[in-house]
Amino acid sequence: MAYIYETHLHTCQASACGRSPGRDYIQRYIDAGYSGIIVTDHFYRGNCRIDRSLPWRDFIDRFCAGYEDARNEGEKRGFPVFFGWEENFDGDEYLIYGLDKAWMLRHPEMPTWTRKQQYEIVRAAGGCVVQAHPFRARDYNHTIYLSHALCDGVEVYNAGNEPDWNRLAMRYAKIIGLPVTAGSDNHCADTMQPDRLAGVCFDKPLEDIQGYVAAILNRQTFSLHLPVALEPWNGSVAPDLPCRWLDREGEDTGRDIMEILRRGTPAEK
C-alpha cells in the first residue's frame, strides 16, 4: 500500500494567495486517497497575509492559524496534518520542515536571516530545507537563484509549474545529487482536482513530520506521486530568467547554468 502525502499547501488564514481555510482541505484530501498533508503557508518575506507590524508572538499565533485549523479538523477525522512553512528571499523560495510554533516563537530574528543563516539554523534545530520550484518564472521574481549548497532537497515537480520548469528542476537535482520531492502547491480546496495533485509516497505511514525530515536527510527511499509522467530534460530548454548559481555562503559563483545542465558537471558543496 502506498501512503501519499501533500508537501506544499497554503491556507487563506496565513497566505495572501490562499483561498481556503485549513479545515476545508481535509475531507477533500481524504477523498483523493491521501494519507496526510503538510501545511506550508507563505512566511514573513513571502506572500504572507499576516500584518508584519504585529508583535512577534501575535504574528506567529496568526501565522499558525491555518495549520491549526487544518490540524484540528484532521484530528476529528483521523487524518494527519503536519506543519511547515515557505520562505522567500529574492523570488527563490524554500520549504521548511521539522520545526514548530514554539521554536518559531523563540526566533524573532527569522525575518533578517540570509539563505545561509536559514539553512544552518534550521538544520541545527533538526529541520530540513527544500528549495521549492527552483526554475519558476513569475512576475514576482526576476532572477533564478539556485542554492544547491543551502538546501537538503529539491521540489522537482510542482503542480503549479510549467512542464519545462519541472524538467529543468529534475535535471538540476540529478546533477547536484539531492533528494527530490513533489507537491501540489495547493491554494484552494474548492477547485482542487484529484487527478492534478502531486505529493510523495511511502511504504509506511509517517508518524510525524520528523519522519519526513529523516527521509530527506538520510536519503531514505520514497517515491513521487505525480499526475503525469515527468519527461526528461532534452538539453535545449533553457530557464526563462537569468540564473545565479550560489555557493555555500549564498554568493553568486558566476557559473554558466546551461553549461552545467548540459554537461552534468557536479557542483561542490
Explain the meaning of each model-derived region.
Residues 1-7, 11, 21-27, 91-102, ...:
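Charged catalytic cores and adjacent phosphate/nucleic-acid-binding surfaces used
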Residues 38-39, 130-131, 155:
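Conserved beta-strand positions in the central sheet of alpha/beta enzyme cores
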Residues 4, 30, 71-75, 116-130, ...:
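Surface-exposed amphipathic alpha-helices with a cationic face
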Residues 13-16, 59, 105-109, 131-134, ...:
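Short, flexible loop segments at the rims of nucleotide/cofactor-binding pockets, characterized by
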Residues 60-64, 104, 108-120:
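C-terminal active-site-proximal or functional interface alpha/beta core segments in diverse enzymes
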Residues 84, 132, 183-184:
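Generic beta-sheet signal
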Residues 1-88, 148-149, 163, 188-190, ...:
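An N-terminally biased module of ancient metal coordination in phosphate/nucleic-acid-related enzymes
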